[in-house]
Structures are given as structure tokens and as C-alpha cells.
Amino acid sequence: MLKKYSWKVLSVVMLLLNAWWIFQTFQYDHYQEPLGKITMVKKVEKTDTVDEHQNKDIISTQQIHLTLLSTENKGKELTILNKFSQSRIKDQEYKIGDLVFLSIKDNDFSQATIIDSKRDTGLAILMLGFVLLLIVIGRKSGVASLIGLLINTGLFYLLLILYEHVSSQSLIWLSLLFFPIIVTSTLIVSNGWNQKTKISILTTLCSTLITFVLGVSIITLLKHKGLRYEEMELITRPQHVLFISSLLIGTMGASMDISITLSTAMNEIAQRHKQLTPQSLYQSGIQVGSEVIGPMINIMFFSYLSGSIPLILIFLRNDMSFNYTFPISLSLEMTRALIGSIGIILTIPITSYIASIFLTRGNQHER
């Protein structure tokens, strides 16, 4: 897909853009909120607290001295009190050298408060490391992956923009419209337009649609029983519509991953063994799929469930029962993981069957 030198040019452009982003994070006057740098910290008070569940915590008070780095009052020294708990659930402790965003109303510096830490510099450096490693290790494939990521980000942003101007119930149809575009663009950019890509696109579309229809049908027949939408209670759009749309996106990612892995392996087998019959190649595909299905499903479950660990610990720490904690915090994630895993399982025979037909078509004519 990428010519001999074009990927090197694109690599340099991406690295320069990332370096420019890092440079911009040090241009403090570009931020809307006033920015300050902490120069001295002193703990002035510490109080033990116990809540109604006998959970113990310690509330500490810091006296923070900082210097303004932006606005017309740049260089002005401020002193602010900051309270933080030992648990750090809703607050945090600040240290010397931290950069923080401030809230200053009507230039009343005596009432200034800290909004949050400035973290974008670290994020930009982390992104630079990600891009650099992807280019160094992946080379042309790495650059293609970055381009695909940018295209998909743009498509997803366009999807959200369109959703703002249509009815609340239309997100599912918009997702169904965009998902073949995302699949096609991702695979073509990553692998070029070839037999392997055609197989991957076709099998991803088939397995994703079958899994999505199966999952939505079961959820609808059960009338959404067992699904706890409390974690989405602040959303003003229909929660079940957003959840069902997320099922499509998650299933698409899982199916695409296993499909390209399997079609690549089967294409390699077909290239090395020209006389393979469709049945033999199909069995080879099933065997390869059985080797990767375990790790793929584990990745699916851990990636979905890991995000709920903090909420589970908070609930259990506050004497919530297991019977209450796990359904309310894991029902949606578990459903996403289960349906995504079904997609992985179905993708293996679908990809093996379609690939065995496409990749042995010439062999049958020769015989």
C-alpha cells in the first residue's frame, strides 16, 4: 500500500507533528484556564475521619505556594490551601514542581482554587513513544496502522457529529452504516488491496453482522433483563441504544482481529502447499483458529472487565454485598465480553470456509 519512500516521509511527518504537540504543551498562554507552578508545599493539618460504614480515612491540608505562568499576572505568587484524603478518591496531593490549572474569579487571588493537574505534556510524550515504537518495529505496517487509526478516529468523530443532528434512536442505524466503511478502510490501509484483504473484509462483515443480530435478538427477547444501566444514568440519550451500538463496535474489533490473523495464516499455508483441497485448507484454518481462540477470548474479557475493578472495590469497601456489586458494575461489561467472544468463535469457521474457497480456486481448475 505504501511505496518505498512514502512511508519514511509519513513517519517523519508524524514524528514532527507529535513533537510540535509536545512543544505546544509548554506554551502556557494558549490555555484558557490560568496555569501555575507549585514552588513550595507545607502540610498544616491532618484529621482522622470515620464514616457510617466504619471506613477510616485521613484528611490532610496543604499550604501551597505557586507562581502564575500565564495571564497578564504572570509571575505573581499565590498561596492556596488544598485538602486531600488518604484514599484520593475525589482529590489529590500536590508536590513541588507540579503544574496546575487554577480557578480565579474576578481577579480575586485570595479565593483562587486548584482545578486539576496539567497532564497533557506526559500524554504527548507517551504518544510520541507509541508512534516511535510503532514506526521502528512496524515500519511500513506501523505507519499504515497509524494512518488507519487516524481515519477511524475521523470516521468515529463524523458519526458523533451526525448523531447530534438526528433522532436519539438512529445511532444503531448510523453505526450499521459506518461499520463496513471502518472495516474496509482499516484493512485496505493496513494490508493493501489483495486476496487476503478481500477475505478479511468479507468474513469480518459476515461474522460481525451474524453476532450482532444474534446478540440483539437475545437481549430483546429477554427484554433487557439483567442489564443494569445505572453507570449510564447521566446520559440524556436512550441508554439501551448506546449500549447496543457499542456491542456492534466491540464485536467488529474482535472479529476483524481474528479474521486478519486467520486469513494471513491460511494464505501462507495455501502459498506453500499449492495442491491443498478446500477441505484440507478449511481444517488447517480451524486448527489455527483453535490455537488462538483461548488467548483472544481472555484478552476480550480482561480488556472489558478491568475497567470496572475500581468501582467494584469502592462498592465492596462500603459494605455492598457481592450480589449487588457484581451485577451493577459488571452486567454491561460482561455482556459486551460474551457477545464479543461469540463473535470470535463464529469468525473462525466463517473465515476458514470463505478463505478455503478463495485460496484454492486455482487449484481446482488445475485438477
Regions found by a protein language model. Name each.
Residues 35-94:
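Membrane-cytosol interface segments
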Residues 85-121:
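Extended, hydrophilic extramembrane loops/domains of integral membrane proteins
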Residues 257, 266-312:
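Helical hairpin unit composed of two closely spaced alpha helices linked by a short loop
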Residues 1-35:
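Hydrophobic secretory-pathway targeting helix
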Residues 102-115, 130-142, 161-167, 268:
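Short juxtamembrane and helix-loop transition motifs at transmembrane-helix boundaries
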Residues 129-131, 140-250, 254:
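Transmembrane alpha-helical segments that form the functional core of multipass membrane systems
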Residues 287, 291-294, 302-367:
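Hydrophobic alpha-helical transmembrane segments of membrane transport and translocation systems
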Residues 81, 109-113, 223-233, 322-325:
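Membrane-interface helix termini and inter-helical loops of multi-pass transporters
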